[in-house]
Amino acid sequence: SVKIKDVNGDGKINADDRTPISRDPDFTLSLNTTLKWKGFDFYMDWYGVSGRKIRNGYLSESNSGGSLQGKLNGVKVNYWTPFNPSNEFPRPSHNTNVTYHGSLAIQDASYIRLRTLQLGYTFPTTWIKKLQLQKLRVYATATNLLTFTDFLSYSPELTPGAYPESKQYVFGINVSF
């Protein structure tokens, strides 16, 4: 069964034990850099948030009609079994209807994501003059490569009904005549 924490320590579970949360993060983080060396260029963009608490729809009433039932849309949950005596989530069953499922679903949605990574090479002018070109650059770009988070879902940025961010790989050529 689920046990609710006596937050204020008065020995009673009541409205005084409620803890306010906010969807707004404590910090928003961003780091991007461009490095160039002998025709090579490298670009990297990291983004993240820290201290954001949200209701995880995969663990709350929007999933399986309000009960865990062991079906969590492919998200692995650390629930109690005789072989795994965890106290993170109650053991799911078809008869389980967790009364406090809403509080179980509040999770830290902090994350750090590598949004963009690009590597390119611009050919020297002496090489491309023979081809009657002013500029020739080849590059590869990848987006949404990595996300570091403890949030139990496909993405800490999206609701369960949305498609997760796709990874994209682009190869290109820039030519100036």
Predicted feature residues:
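Membrane-embedded beta-strand positions of outer-membrane beta-barrel proteins
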Residues: 44, 138-140, 173
